Amino acid sequence: MRMKENAMKNGQLKPAYNVQHVVDAEYITWLTVAPELTDITTFIPFLKRIEKNSNFKYLKIVDDARYESEENYSFIEENNQISFIKPSNYEISKTRKYKNDISRIDNMDYYSESDLFICQNGKKLIANWIKIRKSKTGYESVKTIYICEDCSNCNYKESMH
């Protein structure tokens, strides 16, 4: 696992592990150590180990933004659990700059019946293609890529990229 630079700044690999724990009513009820670099990939195996070894399934999962991923949300939903995971962009999404950024898809109107967005200039962003990405855990994430039908003579074009 690569860790922060040491005083020599030589960036060498150092032995390290990712420690995860569960707290229930102020007591640590489960602990695991994993070699994975990020918390995202430790989440599902961690929950499975808890259920397998303790014969108990937590119905409400509370975590921080380090665990936020489509794969983790899908797992929680498939297992009839409820997630309280803080979105990774939560703090920045509250800023004025974020809310006024017209290039963000979050700040456009979405029409589900037509599967399209309307930009600041009133133009349609239509679904152009589907991108499928497979994670190292094997989970397939499907993303729809949208393009503007006509960006010619758009006053907002420069701020959209």
Residue ranges and their predicted role:
Residues 1-161:
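Anion-binding and metal-coordination hotspots
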